[in-house]
Amino acid sequence: MTAFLLSVTAIVAYFFGSISTVNLSSNLIFHCDIKKEYPLDNLGITRFVKDFGVKGLAKFLGLEAAKALIPLILGGVLLGIVDHADIGQAFAMFCMALGIVFPIMYRFKGSTTILAVGLGTFFIGSGVGFATLVVFLAVYFATRYVSLAKLAATLMMCLVTLMMIDTPFVKYLVLLTALVVFIENRHGIVRLIKGKEKKFRYRKDISYMFDK
């Protein structure tokens, strides 16, 4: 029974993770190819908010959050049948991260785990979630490096989980999820070491982008 419930959780979580929020929102909400029109950088995000406003950004993030919450909740409900809801949620987070980073339908060319794993940490434990969020925000606002903030937050997720969570399988799954996040950011790590990583700053006035 447990193996069957884990299998269902894995399939659903991986499937939802592998769905591209960019492509989905392009077709359902914005009716344009936002991946092509608005690249994931300073200028692209600035132009996106300028064109679609805060409501457009909220719709995009809401869709991304819903896509993450469904497998997390389902994993907890299914494994809750055998009194292991915590393992089900952690397993869903891990499988969802795999789907995001290695989506088979996009030839294993994935996207970012930042929101999905961020929400997943609160399912592991509120203390884990808040500690992870605080570290992410602190490192980001101190350095403006999103990749560095993600890596620091991931390390904090692991540390607090090891300190606060008693279930061994949950700890293992969190560590495996962290491994996926580090693999996702392997190129960013290299750029950080070489000092070539770009900082992210949102600015309402985008005229500076065209300065010589």
Positions of the model-derived regions?
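Alpha-helical transmembrane segments in multi-pass membrane proteins
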Residues: 5, 9, 13, 18, ...
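Transmembrane alpha-helix interface/packing and boundary motifs in multi-pass membrane proteins
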Residues: 12-26, 59, 97-107, 140-145
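Interfacial segments of multi-pass membrane proteins
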Residues: 45, 49-52, 75-78, 95, ...
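Helix-coil boundary and interhelical linker segments in multi-pass alpha-helical membrane proteins
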Residues: 1-10, 72-91, 122-128, 161-173
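Short, non-helical or kinked segments that cap or interrupt transmembrane helices
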Residues: 33-42, 104-118, 145-156
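Nucleotide and nucleotide-moiety/phosphate-recognizing core
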Residues: 56-59, 66-105, 127, 136-137
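Cytosolic, membrane-interface loops and tails of multi-pass inner-membrane proteins
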Residues: 24-57, 190-212
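Loop-to-transmembrane alpha-helix initiation sites
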Residues: 129-131, 146-154, 165-177
